[in-house]
Each structure stands twice: as C-alpha cells, then as structure tokens.
Design a protein with these regions (language model features):
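Arg/Lys-rich amphipathic alpha helix in sigma70-family domain 2
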Residues: 62-69, 79-99, 112, 171
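Helix-turn-helix DNA-binding module
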Residues: 124, 128, 140-157, 168
Length: 181
C-alpha cells in the first residue's frame, strides 16, 4: 500500500500547508523539522518548541513578501524564531524547570539519555542569549557571522557570548554528574 504524502505532513500545522503566499507552503514545510529542533534546543521542551516554531512560521507568513525577497530567508526565519523564543521566556519568566524529558527515541546506549538530560539541564541554566548562541553554533551549525546576523549583534559579541557560555557549561554541576574520572 502506498502511503498518502499528506500523512507526512500530519505534524505540520495547517497554516503552513495552505499556500497563502507563493512558495510559502513549500518553504515552511521544508523548514518545519529544523525549526522545531532549533526551538527545542532553545527551550528544552518539545511542546513549547512546536509552539514557538508555529509562531515563527505565522509571523513569516504575515511578512512573506519581505521574507521571500530577503538575501537569506533562512536567516530571516531563524531570527524570527529566536525572537519568539526570547519573548516567550520573558513573558513566562520560567521559575520551575520541567522534570521529564520528552519521550523521543535515542540512538545508542542508555547512558546517552542521562548525558542528554544533563546537557539540557545545563543549557536551561544559561542566560537566554548564551543559550541561544550555543544552540545556534552547535545545533544549527551556524558561523559567527550567521549567528551575529540572527541576533543583530557583531561577530565579536557572538564569540564572547560563546566563550562565556562554554565556560559556564564546563563549570556546570549538571554536566559534572556521572563523571567517573
């Protein structure tokens, strides 16, 4: 039995599967998985990540003429996503950390689950800007210049924020747990 291609879009919000702007639907559907991954790196929460990714796509939809004509539409979309993430955290002022990780499969040994939990806990302890720089560098694999464009700052600021974030992560008790030597 051949699967219906629409089944693959089940996780994609309806707003991005109805093309209101020429090319928006294809653009949004192709970027959806990466947006959710990036938002998850910023939030550590799967459901919040999907909400933020939807918000980013909704804002991109409204500004589709500008986004589609931008030199780098992906950078434009990343900036929308990062701004939406920062707005969400400012609005919520999260004081309680989620206790459970989402039930996503992990390839590899069971100890990777513990390492992943420790990394997410350590990332949650970073200030939002440092967490954003770490996620954009190591999860999205962006250069200093691309991160600077996304955050609206200089590459030097990106490097200093990255350096501070890495120093804090090295000192993090969450990442120190489980070290056997």
């Amino acid at each position: 039995m051949v699967s219906d291609p629409r089944d693959e879009l089940a996780a994609v919000p309806d707003i991005i599967t109805t093309d209101g702007g020429e090319g928006f639907s294809a653009f949004a559907v192709s970027r959806w998985p990466g947006l959710v991954r990036l938002a998850f790196g910023l939030t550590g929460d799967r459901w919040m990540a999907e909400d933020i990714a939807q918000t980013a796509l909704a804002r991109a939809y409204v500004a589709w003429r500008r986004v589609s004509r931008a030199d780098d539409p992906d950078a434009y979309l990343r900036r929308i996503l990062v701004n939406a993430s920062h707005r969400r955290f400012r609005a919520r002022r999260v004081t309680e950390q989620p206790g459970d990780l989402p039930e996503t499969p992990v390839d590899g040994p069971a100890d990777l689950v513990g390492e992943r939990a420790a990394l997410l806990a350590a990332l949650r302890q970073l200030p939002p800007r440092q967490r954003t720089v770490i996620v954009l560098r190591y999860w999205a694999d962006l250069t200093d210049a691309q991160i600077a464009a996304t955050l609206g700052c200089s590459p030097g600021t990106v490097r200093s924020q990255l350096s501070r974030a890495l120093a804090r992560l090295r000192e993090s008790p969450a990442l120190g747990e489980g070290d056997d030597g």
